[in-house]
Each structure stands twice: as structure tokens, then as C-alpha cells.
């Protein structure tokens, strides 16, 4: 059975994946109205929202997903029928040095949103499970990092892979995933979840792996590579991710989790060398860029391989 969102609250919609989703959805569906709630931390920017298609159908609100009163007001004022929850602290290195903010945003923030939706949809509007299931959606975006790490010969993650998070970041996302599941089974809140592999594409923050490599090359600085660079990631283009999310929102089974991967595994060092070769072609005067590769001490708990 197909579901059609109309008044959508997007959290974290000024960040990398969220802003790409907002732009893509406004361009794809002329009937959708988006309320975009973002705290505008270091990783989000309204610059990511310039020149949106259907800009009159987009309302930006700067605010914190942990602000229960604000979230409740937005749900009521805009008659929100769909929540798409991107907002999260997501940089693993930052979670190692400061895990508290990850627990607050990723766990408490998700709880705040779930509880606000429960109060508005199921209590104030008195929608029973069957009605809520046909007319409301809470979609939660998560990560494949909740599954832990894979060995070289291990099969890729599936939706049945046990959770085994190894960093404060992935542990906080695992906690949020379990809360979403609990609100479905306990209260009948109409939820779906997607767990994605590593994203790349336009608007990605400079601290992330691929932008760091490109920026280091352009500035002639050392390219930091953890350990020996043999760690493997499954890369997913951000717009493909957006399409997958929307497919799940519209056609996914309530209470289910869906993995979205790129089937595109690369060693970190091979990604670095590929970028260096491409920049050698475009900036031959600075070649060879791979002379900038600098192996650095591996980070604690660095998962070796992800694959979906």
C-alpha cells in the first residue's frame, strides 16, 4: 500500500544528507510542503538551501530537536503528517573526544521527536493504530555502523545482522534505533528506519573523508590516512540514498528496518589514490598528489570493513 507525504518535518535539513533530501524531494513532488528544523551547528548551513526548487513550499526553522515545546508547536502549526529524521551528530572522531553531545542529540533528540509525535498523532488526534498507519509516518535515518565491523570474507550486513556498535557515535545511533522500534511495538507509532552505508556527494562537510582528501590536495597539505589505509567502506551517492529513503517512506512496511548500501566497496587508501590521480589530470602542475599521503596513528576502535 502506497503512502503519500504532504506536510513533512525534516530534521537536520541544513546538513549534508538532509539538505540533499530537501532539495530532491521539493523537485520531485510538487504537492509536498517541508518544514526544515535544524540547529545550525558547525555541520549545517543555510547556504546548503540556496536556490531550492519550490522554495515557497519550504519553511526553515532554526532550533534544537531536544526542545520538546518547539517540536510540539511545529507539529501542530504545520499539521505535520510525516517526520523524516536526519538530525544527528555523526563524526566518529568527535564522538571519541566528546561523547556526551552524541548521546544528547542522537538519543535524547530522537526520544523527544518520537514522544512529540505520539502525543500529537495518537493522543491529541486520537488516531488508532490502523488510522495512524495509513496517514502518518515517522522515518528514522541511521547508519550501518550500528552493526559493528566485518572481516574480509564476511558476508555484507543485512537487516538481520546483530547490533554491535564500537564507537560512541554508533552506540548512540543504535540506542536511537531501538527507541524507534520500541515506539512502534509499544505505542503503535507508524515508524520505518533505514541504515545506510557511507555517503558522498555535493554539500558534504569538509571534515569528512573524501572532502578532506580533496582539500588537502588543493592546499598542498598532507593527506591523513589512518593506519595502513586498508579499512574498507561501502560508498553510496547521496542522491541515490535520498531516492531509497523516499521509497521506504512511501512503500515500506511499518516497523521494519531497511538497509541502503552502494554495493561499492573501496579501501580507504585506494580512494585516496583515485582522487590523487584525478587531480593529477586536472592540476598537472601540482602532480603527483599522492606524495602528500601521510599515514597516521589509527583511531581507537576503528572498524575495519562495512558493507551492505
Predicted regions and their residues:
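C-terminal substrate-binding subdomain of Rossmann-fold SDR/epimerase-dehydratase oxidoreductases
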Residues: 5, 20, 24, 28, ...
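Residue-level signature of the cytosolic catalytic core of signaling kinases
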Residues: 45, 153, 202-206, 264, ...
